[in-house]
Amino acid sequence: MVKLVFARHGESEWNKANLFTGWADVDLSEKGTQQAIDAGKLIKEAGIEFDQAYTSVLKRAIKTTNLALEAADQLWVPVEKSWRLNERHYGGLTGKNKAEAAEQFGDEQVHIWRRSYDVLPPAMPHDDEYSAHTDRRYASLDDSVIPDAENLKVTLERALPFWEDKIAPALKDGKNVFVGAHGNSIRALVKHIKHLSDDEIMGVEIPNFPPLVFEFDEKLNVVKEYYLGK
């Protein structure tokens, strides 16, 4: 059976500070760096050998991928980066403290923005310091596909082509795959993989550690799902 390992990036500096991060390119905290290394150690202990790895274009996921593969003694494995694996774009909430946002907009409204499947947060202005429209890493994209805010529904619509074009074909080809990504881009793909309803996915949380493993049959039906080390 082929294996797909999802590793959410280790704790970031903004996770630690309780800030909405989204597409802001925030680094790992010291704890997050260690979580990424520990993820790789668990992979090595489990004897999982990868043929292909994918990650986003955000440094916290890229570093997690590299650190985990290094700790697993598999740093040679090919890694492809894609914006389609980026975290959900939190729009105008990006950079705001979650508690302060609740004070400003109300607990209920912020909860809806965070947890609703299809409600968008306020859009990020194009002149915002965190806007992707002026970020060189997205220069090859048509401006119309760069989001100003996303919910989980839109995140799945954005990530799904990468699943269908890259990840799923690799798995069907018998390759074990590592995906170093983000809480919500992983949740979106888990929704698709497990055929979860819009309501069911809202109760799913992806921790920074440990990695989540799916084992598939040749038709990509889930045979087994578990967290490494548990």
Swiss-Prot record:
Family annotation (InterPro entries): His_Pase_superF_clade-1, His_PPase_superfam, Phosphogly_mut1
GO molecular function: phosphoglycerate mutase activity
Reactions catalysed: (2R)-2-phosphoglycerate = (2R)-3-phosphoglycerate
Any Pfam family matching the protein: His_Phos_1
Binding annotation for substrate: 8-15, 21-22, 60, 87-90, 98, 114-115, 183-184
Keywords: Gluconeogenesis, Glycolysis, Isomerase
EC number: 5.4.2.11
GO biological-process terms attached to the record: gluconeogenesis; glycolytic process
Pathways involved: Carbohydrate degradation; glycolysis; pyruvate from D-glyceraldehyde 3-phosphate: step 3/5
Catalytic residue positions: H9, E87
Enzyme kind, highest EC tier: isomerase
Domain of life: Bacteria
Site note Transition state stabilizer, residues: H182
Keyword Isomerase recorded: yes
Family under the similarity heading: Belongs to the phosphoglycerate mutase family. BPG-dependent PGAM subfamily.
Function of the protein: Catalyzes the interconversion of 2-phosphoglycerate and 3-phosphoglycerate.
Name by which UniProt lists this protein: 2,3-bisphosphoglycerate-dependent phosphoglycerate mutase
Species of the source: Streptococcus gordonii (strain Challis / ATCC 35105 / BCRC 15272 / CH1 / DL1 / V288)
Lineage, broadest ranks: Bacteria, Bacillati, Bacillota, Bacilli, Lactobacillales
Gene label: gpmA
